[in-house]
Amino acid sequence: MPKLIIDLNATKENAINELNDFIDNRLHSYESLRNYDLGEDNHQNVSLLSPYIRHRLITEQEVISAALNKFPLPKIEKFIQEVLWRTYWKGWLELRPRVWDDYKDNILINNDKKQLLEKVLSYETDINCFNIWTKELIETNYLHNHARMWYASIWIHTLKLPWEAGANLFLKHLLDGDPASNTLSWRWVAGIQTKNKSYCLLYTSDAADDVRC
């Protein structure tokens, strides 16, 4: 069962404390370390603030203001950009409600794919890293951002499952699941968000035992 935000001891005070801890101790190395997924319960190289932002215990503006009070923009520009992407995607989707409606209309899996979906949800595909990510997603309600892209790429381009069903799985389980960021990220991996551009992980069976593929 997906966790609730309350499971994080999530209060405004707690969110501010987490924000300050990140700024004081980890923000300085965010840009150089953010791309590495070190595995379950080892995500201190990213902010881990997304659940608090998603549930509005803190806002993007509060995060940016606090960060800029500690560091000049050139030192933390990548982090600021990542925060601003959240607001950009929200605005983009609000202006295109049909995109959201189309996603909701296509989240069901066809009968010919249901057996494969069962393997996915029971961690029994032939792709070890994919199984590990599915387990982490369902049991911890979190995935590193790059793991989310890799996962979506395997889901769409290797397993040939519909992107809408994958986006729905994420939105159901992610504690920080944001309708706009989640939907549009899956569309981008599928190659329908940005014309003539998709995200395709070059997965090979030789990488099957590597958690990061």
Residue ranges, per PLM feature:
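Residues lining hydrophobic/aromatic ligand-binding pockets adjacent to catalytic sites
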Residues: M1-S205
